UniProtKB/Swiss-Prot annotation:
Organism classification: Bacteria, Bacillati, Actinomycetota, Actinomycetes, Mycobacteriales
Cellular component GO terms, alphabetical: plasma membrane
Superkingdom in the source lineage: Bacteria
Family membership: Belongs to the LpqB lipoprotein family.
Principal location listed in the UniProt entry: membrane
Protein name, entry field: Lipoprotein LpqB
Lipidation positions, renumbered (S-diacylglycerol cysteine): 28
Record PROSITE patterns: PROKAR_LIPOPROTEIN
Localization (cell): Cell membrane
Signal peptide: 1-27
Amino acid sequence: MTMRAARLSGSTGLTAALVAVLLVLTGCASLPESSAPQALGTIDREPTSEGPTPPIAGRDPDLLLRDFLQATADPTNRHLAARQYMTPAASAQWDDSTSTTIVEKPDTLLESRDGDRATYRIRAQRMAELSADGAYRAVNEPTLENKIEMVKVDGEWRIAELPDGVVMDITAFTKSYRRYVLYFADPSGNTAVPDLRWLSVPKNQLTQRLLSLLSEGPHGAIGAVVRNQLAAPVALRGPITKANGDPDDVGVGLGGVRLDFAGAAALSQRDKELLAGQVVLTLAQADIPGPYMLLADGRPLDERYATNGWSAADVEYLSPSVQAQNRIGLHALRDGALTQVTDNGVVETPGYFGSVNNLQSAALSPDGQLVAAVADAGRPAPEPPRTLMVGTYGGPAFPVAEGGSITRPSWTGDGSAAWAVIDGDRVIRAVNDRATGTVSVQGVDISGLTADPAGPALRLPITELRISRTGVRAALIADGKVYVAVVERRPDGGYALTAPVPVAVGLSTKATSLSWIGGDTLLIAREGNIDPVSTVLIDGSEWTPVTSQNLTPPVRVITAAPGAQYVADSRGVLELTSNTTSELHYWTEMPGLVGTDAAPVLPG
């Protein structure tokens, strides 16, 4: 492996994950709509636990330590499973709440052993840190080293001294924890913003845990730029039950969920819909099936759903994966012009962008009505060789900025602005006024990227910038490394990029291109022949190589949407396809898009 995070495989490949989401949505949407909801039992009732498995008798101390690093992945009862490996005194002194570190390849190194006492040092590669609220943060920090004192108690080795905080092996983490998604609302209230959490919770406690986390709000810097309808003065009122009022095993099997929100009756109709969207999307993604009977101060939150309850289909329009669907088809650059890929072949688009031969990169607004492109100005040095052009699809265009280098433009989800980076250190927004047809250029404050007090500053230049469809996050490549930053709108109307978080931690080669898939996953291309294309979640977890079958590196450009991924390699443009009779994935050449100057273009 050339990247450590590849070992985190809490879910299967990207395609399987997307299929799972669709199954959740369609499954919930197919519930009967003509009758009142009934509790149908607990088909997948979980077995009652009889407590954690005790340590193996007669275990050698080094093997006992390895078992301990597996047991720490069970957080139940303040890590009772792990405390069994300690002496009573050590268990009483150990504070498991200070930190949680996920490691790989732990070594147990013997430093000394004398009769019934032994000293070991655990040495392991840090992979991530896990917050108390389940937020995962990938790290690339020095090797972890913990000194462990062990003694024999009644003939069995036990841990007598250890540092505070939880250390767990990645293999145990992926078995015990599962990824969940909390949803909050973007500032405009038009889309749901994902916030990933990793939890180890029994199914019959999961509904309560997720709603508690929703009420606590988003994690980290994203909290400043999203809306949370499940926040004061709105709060859960009374017990969480099944749809028929049964309080037992809520979320286990069929039967739905009944929730009452105090203070929600005073919300506007739109805010009630956003509250329902947050709750229903969060629960549906966690495989907690509906119907979802939502009340506001004891009465239906919305009379339209008073009888049959809400389903995932009722709020899926807020899902970032649904909004990121490509609705205008594939386009491409070929011979310096913008073309459209049709059933009859590749044809030039009308207007300016299809008639020129000097385009280096291009981006389409989500509705396909606007185009931003970087053109080779053809000017001799020292004049700036690149020009950012903005115009209508099929119509004219005009220059809005110039520079020595300009990144591939990226449109916001509403098509109001195209973002780009000039000369690697200046971020701009080309703001389109559809009423007047004019475009103005607005600078973006990036001081929060290079001097972030909350974490390590990134190093310029920025060579790629992609705005998420939710509008509150930006993925970027700086000095060959991948980050996800927060898009912050200032009170004066200006914008800033802040709080960069490294996500593709440990890449052995530089990243060259990236694209959003939905709202929480990135597709990344990098230099080299080994795993040149991969996916990673926005918290840095689940780094997964994508097949390289039929690719001829280097991979120059990638672009993606849910269910559609394209790359441009040394031969031309290829699409990720799958065998209809197996799970085999491979890249297929796109007819008519061959050559080193061809590049795929999707909305965004």
